Amino acid sequence: SIYNTIDKETLRRFYKKRKPFSHKGNYGNALMIGGSYGMMGAIGLSAKACLRGGVGKMKALIPSCGYQVFQTMVPEAMCLTNGEQVIQHIRVNESFDAIGIGPGISTSEKTVEALASFLETCKQALVMDADALNILSKKKELLHLIPKGSVFTPHAKEYERMFGSSVNSMLRLEHARAEAIRLNINNFQNGFTQAIFALKSNTSEINW
């Protein structure tokens, strides 16, 4: 079968114990881009998940309306602001090991323009979620700008908006795998169970 299951033994192979004399600089530098007026919880929860996942340093780019909310939710994170109620420009002026974009970012005209401009110059693989995917579903001409090796994390409805519906869940898995290959991305299907289509290893993993 082309499908494998993820269990505790699988995860143990990736687990790395932290060295006693290490520091935050040894564990990566991440940037999260998202949030808008009324949707700051999404980027806040995503930032918490990023820190929980083990990143050493994390910055967030958010609109200024959410600064106080975000810093109260995630005091461990550093914070950059752009725009008042929505992000209007996305500029990355330093090196990051990982960049995530989309949670709560909105699909406003200014944000769509900001994402399109960012994708035209970005060469680094991205983790794209939520409204970043909703923007791509409306502006499919942007799909060819997605950096190779990026990660999409759609739930079922976000996936349907991007790639169309499937008759059943098995066909959706096959379709998601084909789209991952076509776009040179890694496709992480959210739901009660998760399906991961990894481009580099050409494998499909099911998390039960």
Which positions does each model-derived feature cover?
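Small-residue (G/A/S/T)-rich helix-start motifs and N-terminal tracts that mark the onset
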Residues: S1-L126, N134-V151, A156-W208
